Amino acid sequence: MINLDGKTALLTASGQGIGKATAEAFVEAGAYVIATDINQESLSLLKDVVNETHILDVTNYNEIKKLIRSIQAPDILFNCAGIVHNGTILESTDDDWDLAFNLNSKSMYHMIKEILPVMINKGGGSIINIASVSSSTKGIPNRFIYTASKAAVLGITKSVAADYINHGIRCNAICPGTIQSPSLEQRLSDMGDYESARKQFVARQPMARFGKAKEVANL
């Protein structure tokens, strides 16, 4: 991890998984860390680790605006909030589509839109968006809406990177595979046969195991 002394990092979905591991990694690197999540119970676990915690529903644009106005200017934005929707196109509804795009894509659009003027004023910054191997390198069965929404994240990332590089602002995406996390455990349990589902998920991993949140954070 690089030295982040004197830098301020703002993260979404910090209560568990990749978001939590990244918040901890930023602290270790010396950053002033502002962690957000919609789940107060999960976020409370970071209260004594990071510098600030804030409850945030990233699908609520007014909450995003209010947060950005209330905190010190971030040098780093880590967009991690997202949801995995299961199903093919024929098994998907408009409500499913709207939920996934609002959380996986539109929330990043709003976070970036509010943070960019702050970073421009500071003379630079770094924006990191969590995308997925699903949409970036391959399609995954039964992940139609998820794949589409994460493809949008890649488009957002590339466009912002091209538009604001001359302002000293970098925008990159990380495209993880399946990561061991509480949300993954819940999805496996929801599939009915936990052990069978877990074996199927592991079987399609190139390393024959799930990735670890800390491995992503260390990127």
Regions from the PLM with identified roles:
Residues 173, 195-219:
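C-terminal helical subdomain
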Residues 132:
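Residue(s) in the substrate-gating loop at a strand-loop-helix junction
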Residues 92, 138-147, 159, 187:
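Active-site loop-to-helix junction immediately N-terminal to the catalytic Tyr of the SDR YXXXK motif
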Residues 112, 149, 157:
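Active-site helix of classical SDR
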Residues 176-186:
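Short, flexible catalytic-loop segment of classical short-chain dehydrogenase/reductase
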Residues 88-89, 96-101, 201:
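Substrate-binding pocket helix/loop in short-chain dehydrogenase/reductase
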Residues 117, 162-163:
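Alpha-helical segment proximal to the catalytic Tyr-Lys
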